[in-house]
From Swiss-Prot:
It is an enzyme of class 2 (transferase). The gene is rsmJ. It catalyses: guanosine(1516) in 16S rRNA + S-adenosyl-L-methionine = N(2)-methylguanosine(1516) in 16S rRNA + S-adenosyl-L-homocysteine + H(+). Belongs to the methyltransferase superfamily. RsmJ family. CDD domains: AdoMet_MTases (cd02440). The keyword Transferase applies. Pfam families: SAM_MT. S-adenosyl-L-methionine binds at residues 101-102, 117-118, 153-154, 171. This is Ribosomal RNA small subunit methyltransferase J. Its main location: cytoplasm. NCBIfam families: PRK10742.1.
């Protein structure tokens, strides 16, 4: 995949070459999308819109730390949707990991989560965020046990991932109507990088084959059900719903 690679660390130690080799990236200095190595983290920038700033994964500080400490925990809609109850903490495959926010919420309440991400740039951002998270004194211990990244296409990985999870979670990219600054910023950068999720409908059937208990699909409230398969079971929040489908028992 071609992208502009920039090293702002000043170290000059060939880190970009290592990054490119690991994730199959090719330097393209004219590309509007840039993957930038800063002294703090790896971030994605849209070079023709510098005001958008960089997008990076941070499980330790910022919004994720606030959500972990002051969010709803087990009361969060995503936790309810996957079926967390009492001692039951399902094993989850998040087949559309993105920046890992929902996966992190599930891991923080005790679920083991395997994140699938096919886009090499997004996978590199997730991997960078995980490395910093794993090294953190406060959350590193449980994060290493509960949150892992698999760089693979969901369409192929969903048919051969082992062991089978109890829950498969899907949050395919869908055009956002909301005008919130954060959504606009992230969606603009993300959609410039990965484009629309044209094959998302094809994920539902293999996800239902893989999950032993249920498949949860996050949708904006105005979006039709995935693959046009309606379900009466959903956890509904302001602006979103989590459609729930039966899996395939072992």
């Amino acid at each position: 995949m071609k992208i502009c690679l920039i090293d702002e660390t000043g170290a000059g130690d060939g880190a970009l070459s290592v990054l490119a080799a690991r994730w199959g990236l090719e330097q393209d200095e004219d590309n509007l999308m840039a993957l930038v190595l800063t002294t703090e983290h790896l971030e994605l920038r849209k070079r023709d819109e510098p005001k958008l700033g960089g997008i990076f994964v941070d499980f330790v500080g910022g919004a994720m730390a606030h959500r972990r400490k002051f969010g709803g925990g087990r009361g969060e809609a995503v936790a309810k949707a996957v079926g967390i109850k009492g001692d039951y903490l399902p094993d989850v495959v998040d087949a559309t990991a993105g920046l890992g926010r929902d996966a992190f919420v599930l891991a923080s309440v005790g679920c083991r989560v395997r994140m699938l991400e096919r886009n090499p740039v997004v996978a590199a951002l997730l991997d960078d965020g995980l490395a910093r998270g794993y090294a953190d004194a406060e959350i590193g211990g449980w994060l290493q046990e509960r949150l892992q990244l698999i760089h693979a296409s969901s369409l192929t990985a969903l048919t051969d991932i082992t062991p089978r999870p109890q829950v498969v979670y899907l949050d395919p990219m869908f055009p956002h109507k909301q005008k919130s600054a954060l959504v606009k910023k992230e969606m603009r950068v993300f959609q410039s990088l990965v484009g629309p999720d044209l094959d998302a409908d094809g994920l539902l059937a293999p996800a239902r084959q893989l999950a032993t208990k249920r498949v949860v699909v996050k949708r904006p409230d105005y979006a039709p059900p995935l693959a046009e398969v309606a379900t009466p079971n959903a956890v509904v929040t302001k602006g979103h719903r989590f459609d729930i489908y039966a899996g395939t028992p072992e």
